[in-house]
């Protein structure tokens, strides 16, 4: 049997599986060291490449998975703003951390979800209502650049969507987190925020 994975490993396999050039480079680096305790020279080189390539990036930090990255982003947003609530898209996925889970899931306690607010994708009226009601408590708004639920069709942002979101977040001291784990470099090598016309100047905060 032959199988065609149209989901591309949930996003990152944009060059396909068993790509000989990529596999060779990965094996070469593996032989030089795997899971080292401190940054290796190649990690520094990659960080410099990323910050040069992504206009709004002042620095790069590596994590072992997307959930670690989004969790750290949430922590930074809370520390920066002094606020606690998280605003996200219904059915959006940003990892397996407690704040991302359905409150009825086994092992999830009330405190995991009581600081989380959810709105529908592409609904600016609903977004504005949340900001009006909870803006002083919301630390961040986290979303993928376009909606790509697991078992439904993807949906692009409507015209002006992200510019409106960015403006409202800036006005209300809300950190805007664009989760590019599944979409990064697929839309634009500078990051999907570039294609969405977000962050028109370096270092938006």
Where are these regions (language model features)?
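Glycine-rich loop-to-alpha-helix module at the N-terminal edge of alpha/beta enzyme cores
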Residues: 2-80
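Active-site flanking residues adjacent to catalytic metal/cofactor-binding acidic residues
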Residues: 4, 89, 178-179
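A glycine- and small-aliphatic-rich helix-loop capping segment at beta-alpha/alpha-beta transitions
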Residues: 20, 78-83, 101-107, 160, ...
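PLP-dependent aspartate aminotransferase-fold enzymes
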Residues: 48-143, 147
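Helix C-cap/helix->beta junction micro-motif
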Residues: 80, 171-172
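Conserved PLP phosphate-binding loop immediately N-terminal to the Schiff-base lysine helix
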Residues: 144-158, 174-196
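Surface-exposed amphipathic alpha-helices with a cationic face
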Residues: 162-170
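Conserved small/polar residues in nucleotide/adenosyl-binding loops
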Residues: 199-204
């Amino acid at each position: 049997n032959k199988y065609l994975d149209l989901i591309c490993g949930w996003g990152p396999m944009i060059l396909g599986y068993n790509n000989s050039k990529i596999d060779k480079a990965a094996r070469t680096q593996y032989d030089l060291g795997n899971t080292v305790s401190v940054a290796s020279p190649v990690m520094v080189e990659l960080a410099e490449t990323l910050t040069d390539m992504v206009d709004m990036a002042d620095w790069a930090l590596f994590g072992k998975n997307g959930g670690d990255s989004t969790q750290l982003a949430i922590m930074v947003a809370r520390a920066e703003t002094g606020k606690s609530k998280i605003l996200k898209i219904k059915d959006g996925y940003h990892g397996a951390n407690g704040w991302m889970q359905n409150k009825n899931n086994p092992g999830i306690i009330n405190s995991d979800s009581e600081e989380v607010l959810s709105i529908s994708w592409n609904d600016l009226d609903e977004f504005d209502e949340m900001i009006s009601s909870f803006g002083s408590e919301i630390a961040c708004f986290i979303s993928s650049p376009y909606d790509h639920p697991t078992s439904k069709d993807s949906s692009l942002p409507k015209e002006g969507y992200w510019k409106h979101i960015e403006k409202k977040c800036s006005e209300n001291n809300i950190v805007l987190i664009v989760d590019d784990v599944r979409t990064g470099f697929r839309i634009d090598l500078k990051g999907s925020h570039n294609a969405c016309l977000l962050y028109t100047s370096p270092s938006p905060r």
